[in-house]
Amino acid sequence: MNFQSKFLTRSQSLKSLLCVGLDPDYCKLPEIIKRSPEPLVHFCREIIDATAPYAVAYKPNIAFFEVFGSSGIRQFEKVIGHLKNNYPQIPIVADIKRGDLDNTARQYARYYFGDLQVDSLTLSPYMGLDTLRPFLEYQDHLVFWLCLTSNPDSIQFQKKRFSETGRTLYEEVAYVANSISPLNLGFVVGATNTYELEILRKQNPDRIFLIPGFGAQGAKLDDLLPVCGRYSLINSSRGIHFASDGLDFAARANQEAEKIHNAMQARFVFL
């Protein structure tokens, strides 16, 4: 089953758009988890098992694993394996934000889509279309291009306007994506940009948006849901998995995910 089918089936079944991010920042892990031989695997498994009833997708962030070198990569692969073996119906978005020359990009695509078999990943568009094409060859998978991100300094580049076209950089990213038009290319649009999100959604009614920045970064569901549309994944990471740093961290993650799920479910029919 391709990414779009898995996403739509899961989203419509749960009547939700919740993507649970997995950012296992070691410094913030509960002490009992830090004593585990594989703390990142232990923590992520607990969070996954606690939130699976409410997750439309999971988004593990590679940076929190890479910091531990080869051990971290092995733990990342085990987390992916846990998801694929136990929750094959839930799509995986590998948050890697790569962007490199086509020959290098081909190696990334082979590892993440070929070997790990993640359903989707995030890429930077900065180096152009030739860095994207090796990923699009895996037609059952989906690529999320960074379009307009939620960090405050994104305006230094992403909202600058091209004199030749009158479009901003983020608008240019969307324009180029539409010029090649495959629907296995989606956009990352930060939750803190609700005005631009609404415009992008009207221009791209059928593209899937990955929307980070909800929860810990301050964006609110009441602002997002009226403008994002059903073809969206609204991500919450820290707000769910670091709801508690005590022994009840998994139970609290379950409660936070359920709370978001219920809020989305109540509004889903209006999306």
From Swiss-Prot:
In terms of superkingdom, the source organism counts as Bacteria
Query: Which ranges of the sequence are coiled-coil?
Result: none
Q: Which GO molecular function entries does the Swiss-Prot or TrEMBL record give? A: orotidine-5'-phosphate decarboxylase activity
Q: State the Pfam families in the record.
A: OMPdecase (PF00215)
Q: Which UniProt keywords apply?
A: Decarboxylase, Lyase, Pyrimidine biosynthesis
- Pathway noted in the entry: Pyrimidine metabolism; UMP biosynthesis via de novo pathway; UMP from orotate: step 2/2
Q: Which CDD domains match?
A: OMP_decarboxylase_like
The active site lies at K97 (proton donor)
EC number(s) for this protein?
Answer: 4.1.1.23
Which BP terms does GO give this entry? 'de novo' pyrimidine nucleobase biosynthetic process; 'de novo' UMP biosynthetic process
Main EC class the enzyme belongs to: lyase
Reactions catalysed according to its record:
orotidine 5'-phosphate + H(+) = UMP + CO2
The Swiss-Prot or TrEMBL record describes its family as follows: Belongs to the OMP decarboxylase family. Type 2 subfamily.
Q: What protein name does the entry list? A: Orotidine 5'-phosphate decarboxylase
State the organism of origin: Leptospira borgpetersenii serovar Hardjo-bovis (strain L550)
